[in-house]
């Protein structure tokens, strides 16, 4: 049941992402540009950039678009300096929320983030109030039909933590430590194992159960946060109730 619950949460998140793909592209380009500016334009020497490229490819961004963003950042042509700030808080029902932002105006950003929390019964907390509930890790998703034995052998040898079947759909997910993510992705590609999506994410150590009404309110808050131009990523420990899943 734990696996099914986890897969339900992943599907829920990805359905929401698909509905906002245009906005996601804008944020991915910003991350690519800043990562290249801060660590250089060579992915093999810049783990943050490599993770950003893998995430962009996982969202079907073209190589040309990625390359342009990287060159703009590496060449110092981005528009001004950006501060990276993570806000922490709780939504309705005690759901823990991390909000990663990239901004050129901190006062504007914190006001907008606080408003989104307050509007839907949540509250913005202090630094460290919920971060301890999350661990940064890589997740690599495979559609049904992949050679599971080969997948497991290659992934674990490259430094993955686990290979797990998600729910009853036949999908597989590889989990990796943050630092091993790029090496595992490279090894899978070298072995001819094509994945559906790969990303570095913040994974909750515990999940907050919600009833349907609470889930609806929390989702509205997440939607509002993700619609903010300065917000890059929103992570929660919400466990979405079964009624929200399609039959």
Curated annotation (Swiss-Prot):
Query: What organism is listed for this UniProt entry?
Result: Alcanivorax borkumensis (strain ATCC 700651 / DSM 11573 / NCIMB 13689 / SK2)
Alphabetically list the UniProt keywords.
Answer: Cytoplasm, DNA-binding, Transcription, Transcription regulation
* Record carries keyword Cell division: no
Q: Does the keyword Cytoplasm apply?
A: yes
- Its GO CC terms? cytosol
- First and last residue of the signal peptide: none
The subcellular location is:
Cytoplasm
Q: Name one Pfam family in it.
A: TACO1_YebC_N
Q: What is this protein called?
A: Probable transcriptional regulatory protein ABO_0750
One GO MF annotation is: DNA binding
């Amino acid at each position: 049941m734990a696996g099914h619950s986890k897969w339900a949460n992943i599907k829920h998140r990805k359905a929401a992402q698909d509905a906002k793909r245009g906005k996601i592209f804008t944020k991915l380009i910003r991350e690519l540009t800043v990562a290249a500016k801060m660590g250089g334009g060579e992915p093999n020497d810049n783990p943050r950039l490599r993770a950003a490229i893998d995430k962009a490819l996982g969202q079907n961004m073209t190589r040309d678009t990625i390359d342009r963003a990287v060159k703009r950042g590496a060449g110092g042509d981005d528009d001004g300096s950006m501060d990276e700030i993570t806000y922490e808080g709780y939504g309705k029902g005690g759901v823990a929320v991390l909000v990663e932002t990239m901004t050129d105006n901190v006062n504007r950003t914190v006001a907008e983030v606080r408003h989104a929390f307050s509007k839907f019964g949540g509250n913005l907390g202090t630094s460290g109030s919920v971060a301890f509930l999350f661990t940064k890790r890589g997740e690599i998703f495979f559609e049904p039909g992949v050679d599971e034995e080969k997948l497991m052998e290659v992934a674990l040898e490259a430094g993955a933590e686990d290979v797990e079947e998600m729910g009853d759909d036949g999908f597989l997910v590889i989990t990796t430590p943050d630092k091993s993510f790029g090496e595992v992705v490279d090894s899978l590609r070298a072995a001819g194992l094509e994945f559906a999506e790969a990303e570095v994410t913040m994974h909750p150590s515990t999940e907050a159960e919600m009833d349907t009404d609470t889930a609806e309110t929390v989702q509205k808050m997440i939607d509002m946060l993700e619609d903010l131009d300065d917000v890059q990523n929103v992570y929660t420990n919400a466990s979405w109730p079964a009624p929200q899943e399609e039959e």
